[in-house]
UniProtKB/Swiss-Prot annotation:
Functional note: Stimulates the secretion of gonadotropins.
UniProt keyword Signal, yes or no: yes
Name of the gene: gnrh3
GO molecular function annotations of the record: gonadotropin hormone-releasing hormone activity; gonadotropin-releasing hormone receptor binding
InterPro entries noted in UniProt: GnRH, Gonadoliberin
Predominant location category: secreted
Entry-annotated residues carrying Pyrrolidone carboxylic acid: Q24
Classification lineage: Eukaryota, Metazoa, Chordata, Craniata, Vertebrata
Species whose genome carries this gene: Salmo trutta (Brown trout)
Name the record gives this protein: Progonadoliberin-3
GO CC entries: extracellular space
Compartment(s): Secreted
PANTHER family on file: GONADOLIBERIN (PTHR10522), PROGONADOLIBERIN-2 (PTHR10522:SF6)
Family: Belongs to the GnRH family.
Record keywords: Amidation, Cleavage on pair of basic residues, Hormone, Pyrrolidone carboxylic acid, Secreted, Signal
Amino acid sequence: MDLSNRTVVQVVVLALVAQVTLSQHWSYGWLPGGKRSVGELEATIKMMDTGGVVALPEETSAHFSERLRPYDVILKKWMPHK
């Protein structure tokens, strides 16, 4: 009798653990697993009244290399053969 009670408890615990691990959280604009689609992100930004989607500026190669100049000096100091 003790073995059957123990088995029932184990099955119930297994079922509860399986339910918690397999359940998904759903909220407005979110896909299962906490992922967002690009369209939903755009809709959320518009919903927040930011005036639309903010475009990131494209960096020119000169500006980019200028930003990396301190790192280039460090690399030349520590790796003179390159």
